[in-house]
Amino acid sequence: MRILVTNDDGIYSPGLWALAEAASQFGEVFVAAPDTEQSAAGHAITIAHPVRAYPHPSPLHAPHFPAYRVRGTPADCVALGLHLFGPVDLVLSGVNLGSNLGHEIWHSGTVAAAKQGYLFGLSAAAFSVPLNGEVPDFAGLRPWLLRTLETLLRLERPFLVNVNLPLRPKGFLWTRQSVRAYEGVVIPGEDPMGRPFYWFAPRPLKEAEEGTDRWAVAQGFVSATPLRLDLTDETRLQPTLAHD
């Protein structure tokens, strides 16, 4: 099996290499990741200028994987990775430093990279861990990465799955996407030159429902949410719907 690994935190993120190492237990791994952080980049692709890629060494004390540092978005990395490395069977994105739960998948570069792989007809999965002031212990999470990958690889292909791991998992659950409505908080500030700036600091408005991704992670479970890309509202496609 040939596996392409990417992320949105950038090629220097420890989560990227933790996922690459875990994936190497299942096949031949190739890495193509952004040269700078691309968090919340969504499914943007670069069309206004060329995308550049540079060979990149694996970190010290890590297995060697063919890797490129890409001056582009997470979705760019998948498209370019398939060009540079040739066909693959699986696209993995992460492990993101920060959860991607509920409506966060709309703007997540991590999930978008997996979606890009799925758009090419490939099986794909995104992996994330929460950031709450504690540094993730990727060595401790390794058994759960392996167990989750084993579970995913038993699915009918192609699949698209969003995986969120708590910092100390106690089990695995299949979940549905939560509804994460936000209060849009804008925090103003001023730089030393007297120019205004603004931070966006959204806060969730309600508790997560049981069986959802956010609920599962809060309870200490690895959450795996199968996704689809068809956004059609089937309830509005009634046979009696008039055509203009």
Swiss-Prot record:
Known EC number: 3.1.3.5
Lineage: Bacteria, Thermotogati, Deinococcota, Deinococci, Thermales
Reactions accelerated catalytically: a ribonucleoside 5'-phosphate + H2O = a ribonucleoside + phosphate
Domain of life: Bacteria
Organism the protein comes from: Thermus thermophilus (strain ATCC 27634 / DSM 579 / HB8)
Keyword Cell membrane carried by entry: no
Protein name (database record): 5'-nucleotidase SurE
Short name of any one Pfam family annotated for the protein: SurE
GO cellular component, one term: cytoplasm
